[in-house]
Each structure stands twice: as C-alpha cells, then as structure tokens.
C-alpha cells in the first residue's frame, strides 16, 4: 500500500507536467486545429527564460532576503508573460501565412520552428547544461513511510491552480466564449465580429504561458536544463493532447495525467525495461477502442490533414 | 499559394527573363531532349574523368571539387572562384555546347529511340544514366557514400509520400517501418553469411551473399509491411490526428521492442553486415521503387487512395473499399520503407535502434514536404536537395540547423504543398524528343 | 547594368588570380589529422569539448613549429568535421576525410553509435582511427586499424563490483541504467555479472532502467528503495546523474551511490550539488589532487576555456598525443599517404607505456588500451578526491 501510494504521488507530479504541456497543445489544437509541433520547444524556451528571470531575481532580492516562494511566484508570472510573446511571434511568422494551407504544412513549419528554437538556444547559452536555481529549499516529509517533498506539493498545486484558472477563463469569460466559438467554425465566427487575428495569437499566448509555467516547475523538480529537453516531452504531450480529444481542453489535462500514471505504473508493475513498450501498447489499444479520444466528438471528415 | 501571389511571381519571372535575356542564352536548352542532357553530362563526366585533376590543379584547387565545390566553398572562401570556374568549365560548358550544337542530331536519335517499345528505350536510358553515375561516383568514394544514402532517402521519401501525400494521412511511423526492415534484413544476412557472436557460424559461403541479398531485403520489407498492420487496422475507424498518434505510438513501440531484444544486440546495435549495398544494387532498387510506386499510384488502387484522401465517405459511397485501400497502401508503403531500411543497414554495416528516432522522422518529413506532396518528381527533388544541402552546409555546424529550417518555412509559406506537388510522373513525356514539329 | 557586370567580372578574376596562386605554394607536405566530432545533434557538449581539446593541441604543435619526423618539421592541419551525432553522417564524414582530405589518422567519433560504423570505414581504407570515448567492444573488434582511448566495460564493471565487496562487504546491490544507450547498458550488464559471481545468484536485487531523455525516475527508485539494496550503481552521464541522485535522496535513499567514468566532469557537481557528496565513482583521473602532466593539462584547459575538462577532453587529448607519438616515430614522412598510414598504424600498435593524462597505457592486439582506473570519492567540499587505484 505504501509502495502504491508513493508511486501514486510520483505519478501525480510527473503527470502534471504532461498535463500542463498537453493543455498548451490542446489550446492550439482544439481552437485552431493546428499541430503546434514547436510546443515542446516553447516549453524549453520557457524553462530557459525562467532560469534567466530567476537568476536575475535572486541577484536583485538575494540581499534583501526575500522568501523563496515569492521569488518563485514572481519568476513564474514574469516568465509566463515573456514566453507568451514567443508564442505570438511563432503564430505570426509560422502559422498565420499558412492558414489556408493544408494542416500538415503548418505542422512541418512548427517542427522547423522548434529546430530553430533549439539551435538558437545553443547559440545563446552554449552547449553546457544549466542547473536551475533551487528557489525553494527542499523539505522532505515522511508520512507513514511515504516520502513527499514540499516541491511535489507546490508543483501539483500550481498546476491544478493553472488548470482551474484556464477552465474558468474558457468557460466563463467573453474571450473564452470567443475561443470556444472559434473551435466550432473559424469561417463563420469571424463574420460575427470576433477576429481570428485576435483569437489566434491569444490562444498561442495562453498555450505558451502554460508551457512556460510547466518549464519552471520542471526546472524545480528536475533542475537540469538542456536544449533538447522539450522534444520527447513535447511529442508525448502531443499524444496526451490528442488522446484527450478534440474540442476538450480539460480532456487533454486528464489525458496528460493518465499518461503520467501509465508510465509510472507500468514501470512499477512490469520490468522497467519494458516501460515504453507496454505504455505505448496501452495507448494504441485505447485508441483502437476509442478512436476519437476520451472526450472528442466523432467528426472524421473535418480531421483531414 | 494564393493565386494573386502566384501571378506576381510569374510576372516577375517573365520580366526577369526578358530583361536579362535568359531566353536568348538558354533558349536552346528547351529544345534539348532528355537524351541530350544525358549526353551533356556524359561528356562532362568523361572530361572530369580524363583531365579533371589537371583542370583542378590549373585552377588552384587542391583536388577535384567532389560535390560541385560545395564542400570547399564554405571552408575556404578564397577558393570559390576556382570552384565556380571548375563547374563552368567541366559541367556547364559541355552541357551548353551539346545543347547548342548537337541538339538537332540528338533529337533525331531520340526520335528513333522513341519509336522502340517503351520498356526497351527506358532500359536503354537507365543504363546510360547508370554509366554516367558510375563514372562520376567512381572518382571519389565520398561521392559513392553520399549517392547511396541519397538514393535510400529517395526510396524513403517516396514511400512516405504514398501515405502522407497520396492518402493524406499524417503517418509518424515511418522510422519504425524502416527499423523493422533494417533489422530483419540484417538478421537474415548475418545468420547466413557472417560469423557473428549473436547468431553463430555462417551458414552459407559469403560469395553467395550478393545473390541472396535481394531476398533478405524483401524479407525486411515484408516484415515492415506486416508491422504496418498495427497502424493500418486502427486506421479503419479513425484518421488524421488520431492516426498520427497511433503511428507515433507504433514508432515508440518498435524502438522499445528492439532495445529490449537481447538477441538483436539491444541498444548496443547489430554490426558486422557485409557491405552488400553497393552502388549498382542501391541504384537498381531505387529505380525499381520509383517504377513500382509510380505504377501503384497511377493504378486503380492509387486513384482510390486519392479518393480516400479527398473524401472518405464519398469514396465509400462510390463503392471504393476504403478498408482494403488503406491496408494495401499502408503495407505497400511500409514495404518500401523496410527495403530502404535494409539497404541503409548494409550501407552502414551497423544498425542501432537509436538511429530510428524522432530526428530521422523529422528528416523524412522535411524531404517529403519540401519536394511536394502527391508527386514522384517532388519526392526525388526533395530527397536529393535535402541531402545535397545537408552535405554542403555541414561546415556551418550550428547555423546549418537555422538555415535549413528557415528555407523550409519559406517553402511552406510560399508553396504549402511543396515545390513540385500534385504532378504526374510520365516517363514517356520525359523521354520524348523535342523540337521537331 | 554593364558597369555592374564589369565590376563583378573584375572581382571574380582578382579572386581567381588570388586563389590560383594556391598552386604555387599548394603542394607542400602537410600532416592532416581528422577530427570527427558531434558538434551539433544530441550531444553538442561532447563535440565542443572535442573541438576545444583539439584546438589546444594544435596550438602546442604550432608553437613547436609542427610535428618533427626524422629531424624535419612538418606543419599540421586539423580537419574538424561535424557528424551531427548520427551514424550515417559519421560514415560520410569519415569517408570524406579519408578520401578527400587525405588525413593520416582520424580522431573520433566519440560515442559508439557513430564509432562502430565509422570504424568500419576507417578499417576498410586502412586508415588508423582512434576513438577516444567509445566503450563498445565492436568498435575495435577485428579491426586492426581502429584503436580507442578508454577502458572497456568488461574491465570497469567487475572492478567496481570487486571494489564494493572489498571496501564495504555489501551483498545486495541495485542498478539503474539507460536501456536505450549502449554505454550504460554494457556497464550495467558487466557489473551485474561480476556482482552475482561474487555474491551469488539474485544478489542484484533490483535491476531497473529508463530511456534516454527521461527526467522522472521516481517509480524505478521507489522500487529500488523497497528492494532493500545496500548500494546503488548508476552508470550514467552527469546530467542524468544529477537528476537520479537528487530524486533518490528525496525519496529517502541514504546509502552509498556508485558511479562510472562518465561522472568525471566538473558539471556533475555543478548540477548535482551537495546531494552527490560522498558518492564513489571510477574514473581515469582525479581532478582534485592531480599531479604531473594531468594537473598541467587541467590547469591549462581551465585557463583557456574557463571550465574544468571532463573525461572527453582528457581522453581526446591522450588520443591526439598517441597519434602524435605514432607520427613522430615514423622513419620518414613520405607523402605517400597509404604508406604513411600503414606505418602510423604499426607504430600505434607498438606503443607501450604511453604516459597520458589518463594514466599509462599500452595497446592490446585488438587496439584496446590497458590502463589503470582510479576510484574517486566526492568529498564534502565537492572535490574529486583520490580514493584507490585499481590496475588490471
């Protein structure tokens, strides 16, 4: 039981990264029907921006003795803000000119923008891997044989908070309503006075901001940043986003958690060498049984690439 | 591209032609048939073979510039004029002279050839082409390696184009198919011909290897085709985005499976293959793949894949068996990816599951979408251009990975379906004589 | 228009004349050495270290006026090419350097994934190649022209297993390694073999793995902690080491951790911090308290590039020095590249007791070095302290 609970908590942390990144994917995917293959690299850029901001804040406030959690919150907010500009820029350069093109072409542009982000990152920061500053002192609690660190609690709490915030934004605000409308039909909705040229950058901005938050939390939990860290995570979050189903943003978050749970628990139950094999077989089976993801609606003709 | 953009481009192009007088200079090229180009290159290659070294020496080049001077240009910019002069003297001059003075005669010859049955003259052209390639590549082993890998890239690009271009799915499993082919083909040749620590003594003498190599490749291809069923069967009920992640999951599964199979060497990879994939073998397989894939996409089932792409429901209503179409197309494309994988393994004489990862996938995507969807010529252009550019820009190290993506993005913005998309590939038209009215 | 083309033509011909003057001085005898490094791709840090080390070496040579062969000095040119950390690019690059640039010997590629196919190329063209970092036995096996600079897994794995047995007397061990990467995998296997030979079947109580680029090891570590192992063996690269060790500590692991030569980088401490203090690992040299040429090398490198060199740098340096020694031992530099390569290969195989930065070494007939390993303990100040030396 302890063993199970310990892994449950591990999976909660790991799943929240997938969920946060998948949310960003799903924003773009559900509303604009684009694969944003650059998303993993936006996540990476977010982590690096977070690193710069955090270092700056530590340098500024270090003498004053500001508490770590304050620096962390400030870092997250500022980096989310800055990274959202990267998202907007990518939308403007890479996706807007391709709005009438086949969706696969946009996916390729995304892939290429991702490579550019990685390369320019190496050009700026060098090939060295970077240690993310530990903003919060790690405290380990031992509750009945289960080890929980304060970082784990912070990470899960912040990601749940962000998810709830996004849900509120999408469901309750005017902008959110415009986005939902856009996801129904982006030919008719612009005629109703909602400009696609406003909604699309906004979607990218929010998605990138979430990726930046994920990047900083990732830096807290796994404090080694490297320029290629976004690739595999991005592709896996892509799996989660689509597993959640088109048109369902919270579905993506749930699928992200599910992916985390599948990975952790297959490693727990089976020999861990077989983890990828079994985890992805499960996903293959899920998709064979439920071909439109968990919450997606079946409208296959509009899913053409 | 939007029509108005296209119009401006076209007009500019026309203006340019008039201003610079391209028409006057290059007009006679348009009267040259395919045979003329071959003759032109043949003479260029013969010149290079005979006196290439002397010309290079005269121009102050250390050696003959192997890949049209691309390699030395970026490393030693001082040599650029020399390399350019070399290209002009050795390649452009013979071509121009052939076009200027022999067009008529060659056209007559081409017309004579054209009267023969198409298979006969096609084979003649291919043999001629191979002779040129062989002489050209024979001058440097670096050319041979680059050519072999380029040819393999052509097969890969074509086979992915069948799924992504002709059928309109977004399949991410191609490296998985390639890995299956590479591993199965290598296993066969290793069991049969190599004294190896994984499979023990060789069963057959190694002089038989070149003859049985095609069988090994076909086994690899069939293995990949069978593997593709795992992707093809879920594709009955879903498509587009969901199929993309099914195929992605398939790729991860194959990679993880190979890593766990200790029999195949696991992550350590499998080495010791005989270098069976020499230039003629790779060339023949490439031509075969172009021929068969072209036949496939122009056949009834090929047209059916197009129908499935454009509207699956309508296709179904028109009595197209969409399930059969999907299965056959997937298996067919996977077969060729497997063959390419097998060739790849025997060029490198080593395979490793890490080679068949996301990076390779991105590379194949780039080639397909650069060249053009739904087009055989496009795929060939995409593969050749990417491989050449990749070699040429290598000295730039990091900046290569900024330049290539930027080019790719520009292509996607101005020609969203690729350079030469939606073109039919008609060998008869290409080989037809020109100019005679 | 006409003026422009006139100017262009003029520029063209001037440049042409400049470059053509090449053949006046072009046919000088130059010793060319190829460096096949992963400058872009998955492991850019390795490529950068290789390049930096090679440049430092070249500086030395240039200061000395070239490599001296039979009393005459010849200039040296490095041909540095990028293999993108891909097997096919490594093959292309090796072919290019050997057939086009006519290098006398190739240094690199570093990781086995590229070194095995590239070694095949070098061997078929009878060109000596030294891979500084590749630990896979297949790299040099049955290839008389291919050498390597590092020791092999079959030596390092058992050595670590024996070290723990002698030093601590533990009987239960756990291993966590990357199943998709051949260096950790090979080492993990040999360690397991040796450990089970020492302590009986099933004494490796937990044998867990992950895949390259994973960042979360909590599930595997939970398993390891619950298995009751007394020591954890992590044969990983330093970026993964930092994550694994930190997470292990967070999950309550307080027992010793054991590493391999890939830990031997200053970045281990930068990334891992105090969590790694007290861990042991085997390596080629201990940077704290190094003596003689090793210290000299570390200091110079640090001064030039402002970071402490890691094992890649040290091994590349030794490989370059080995190549230099083999070239210097030539009876004459004939300019006939085939003959020279053959002789260099012969000299390389005959090198005995070469005094390198990573210890003294000689080559076995297979082209693998025989050299001692050092066990290092990470002190509480974060320094690599010499603990014990083990020789084969």
Where are these regions (language model features)?
Chain C
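Extracytosolic ligand-binding ectodomains
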Residues: 2-16, 20-392
